[in-house]
Amino acid sequence: MSSLSRFLLRGNFSFSTHTNRRFFSAVTAAAATPSPPKPSLITLVNDERDPKFITEKFKKACQAEWFRKNIAVYERTVRRLAAAKKFEWVEEILEEQNKYPNMSKEGFVARIINLYGRVGMFENAQKVFDEMPERNCKRTALSFNALLNACVNSKKFDLVEGIFKELPGKLSIEPDVASYNTLIKGLCGKGSFTEAVALIDEIENKGLKPDHITFNILLHESYTKGKFEEGEQIWARMVEKNVKRDIRSYNARLLGLAMENKSEEMVSLFDKLKGNELKPDVFTFTAMIKGFVSEGKLDEAITWYKEIEKNGCRPLKFVFNSLLPAICKAGDLESAYELCKEIFAKRLLVDEAVLQEVVDALVKGSKQDEAEEIVELAKTNDYLQCKLRLFPKE
């Protein structure tokens, strides 16, 4: 009998009888058959709602080797526990991995380090990295990069540069382009943009080649932080070095142009990305909408909004945060009303404050029935519960 089965038969599992039966069936089947019903066991973990039971189910499921190979279920479980503020249980399920032979494999350990980093638990990530030699697990650029990523994702920006300078020489690790890219991201995070840009030359001096990720980090940092001229210089260097620009490169520049009210140049750049056979995504259209809204060109902004769905994308709430207040301010209450109805009909996300702004505008514009309808839709829909006031605050 497998250890999983013995555990369950002892009666220590604190779930409901129905849940016990389902979990027992899945785990014993996983242990007894050559081809385990993987989706069933994963589903049992994913479908659980109680953080305590998520933790217990996950730990027991980890006894199946194939389950430990599933990256997605680890990421989802850690994310859900962190969202519930149960960081002690994040630590519990990741510490549980120490009992398995996977922890002697660098790829698996790098995953654990990254998972800690994604939820801001850098000290735990550092501990896992430091303990690798005890498990006869060699540390290379793979785990080093995971540690750097954990540091950046945990927003420990002041520590990134020190780790980068200290560990490679100490552990005989040769940083690669991915290492430098993470360092660049960390420097940008602490506001050291000039030092981050200077690393392009250092990368090349090391015999490495900056890639599109290197430049995309710098493009995003410059264009989104109001450093338009610096962004244009980075873009020019990218072209000069013949680094292929992807949709993220174009999106960053489009946003920069939008913030500078350069709608004509935005349209020209959009045509270029299409000419380069790149597929625009929702962020592309969000930037276009933002630019036209900023210039007060609402008809054009609405036209670009309609392009989102035509291109197989779903609008993000940032689109409505930009578009709806502008439409209300322009006095086009009918369009604002219709757009709100579309949001609920298509189950799209929007901030409650933006919806309230529309309701207030409708009431002030003597469109009481329309305002009441939006309030009712916000109250009765089954995916986005909002408590809207029918009358504006005085």
From Swiss-Prot:
| One Pfam assignment | PPR
A GO MF term: mRNA binding
User: Entry's InterPro entries?
Assistant: Mito_RNA_Proc_CCM1, Pentatricopeptide_rpt, TPR-like_helical_dom_sf
Q: Give its localization.
A: Mitochondrion
- Its main localization is mitochondrion
Does the record carry Ribosomal protein as a key word? yes
Alphabetized Gene3D superfamilies for the sequence: Tetratricopeptide repeat domain (1.25.40.10)
State whether it acts alone or in a complex, and with which partners, per the record: Component of the mitochondrial ribosome small subunit.
> What PANTHER family has UniProt attached to this entry?
PENTATRICOPEPTIDE REPEAT-CONTAINING PROTEIN PET309, MITOCHONDRIAL, SMALL RIBOSOMAL SUBUNIT PROTEIN MS78 (RPPR3A)
Name the record gives this protein: Small ribosomal subunit protein mS79 (rPPR3b)
Native species of this protein? Answer: Arabidopsis thaliana (Mouse-ear cress)
Q: Taxonomic lineage per UniProt?
A: Eukaryota, Viridiplantae, Streptophyta, Embryophyta, Tracheophyta
